[in-house]
Amino acid sequence: MQCIVKICGITSEEDLKAAKELGAGFVGFVLEEKSKRYINLRRLKSLSMITREPLKSVALLVDPSDDFLERLLMSSKVDYIQLHGEESPERVEEIAKITNVPLIKAIGVEKESDLLRIRKYEGSVDYILLDSKVKENVYLKGGRGISF
């Protein structure tokens, strides 16, 4: 099994430099407006343009609309899209067809039985990301340093 480190919440050139120096494989850009690490599509474009190998750029989205996906694709080139919402397996397959970009699906884990959800996404995503399931604030899905 391969473990890849993704540092998410990149908002600046300094963040990118630090992620590379620390050996991250992926860097994540949060496009969810409710997040304190949110960046807009214009900022994503500038940061993704300077993201260099071996780093892979990841656009983190929460339940994206088709319109938003189209705007994302027109404004930036990202290596991966991470789906961090309540996207069904069917919706994930639609997103794969619309974007033709490799997908990462985040699965919230609170208890062992939550891991069973992984099977639903087999074959429709390139990676599964296990994250803590956060109860107290449904709008901030993960990435808060909470272990499970």
Describe every region a protein language model picked out.
Residues 1-148:
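Conserved N-terminal beta1-alpha1 strand-loop-helix module at the mouth
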